Swiss-Prot record:
Its main location: nucleus. One of its GO terms (molecular function) is protein heterodimerization activity. The gene is DLS1. One of its GO terms (cellular component) is CHRAC. GO terms for biological process: chromatin remodeling; DNA-templated DNA replication; regulation of DNA double-strand break processing; regulation of DNA-templated transcription; subtelomeric heterochromatin formation. Gene3D superfamilies: Histone, subunit A. The modification Phosphoserine is found at S17. This is Protein DLS1.
């Protein structure tokens, strides 16, 4: 038959399979509280769609990174590495906004020092002497722990209360 099929495809032998494991896609879907019974073909389609989504996001991020590196004087490296900032920048600057829905999931990072200087974040550290640290861990679990960084993301500038004062 010249390696041609006679028009019949067997359900057990797909033409191609996704690179992502379908079983993991099923497991993730079944963890959703709104999960409904779904066919195996739908899970395969979801795996293919996820692969395509990851490819688009990676391509956009690499393209954005290459544009930024071309503006710099040093030559481009042979190997490119994507960072979180590259991906979040690609999401923010997506050409037609097709990645904007990811803004809440992958937000841009902000420099803590700049936020403190702008008075948008209160940043305090407290260091305890070693003998108090030991007693705090052994005797009292509710005592303040050493080197605790308190960040108050409250945008109210007129509110001068500290997070520890509210307890």
């Amino acid at each position: 038959m010249n390696n041609e099929t006679s028009g019949k495809e067997t359900a057990s032998a797909p033409l191609c399979s996704p690179k992502l494991p379908v079983e993991k896609v099923q497991r993730i879907a079944k963890n959703d509280p709104e999960y409904m019974d779904t066919s195996d073909d739908a899970f395969v389609a979801t795996a293919f769609a996820t692969e395509f989504f990851v490819q688009v996001l990676t391509h956009e991020s690499l393209h954005r990174q290459q544009q930024q590196q071309q503006q710099q004087v040093p030559p481009l490296p042979d190997e490119l590495t994507l960072s979180y900032d590259d991906i979040s920048a690609a999401i923010v600057h997506s050409s037609d906004g097709h990645l904007q829905f990811l803004n809440d999931v992958i937000p841009t990072t902000k420099n803590l020092r700049l936020l403190v200087e702008e008075n948008r974040v209160r940043y305090t550290t407290s260091v305890m002497p070693p003998n108090e640290v030991y007693s705090a861990y052994v005797v009292n679990d509710t005592a303040p722990k050493p080197n605790i960084v308190e960040i108050d993301l409250d945008n109210d500038e007129d509110d001068d209360e500290d997070v520890t004062d509210q307890e």
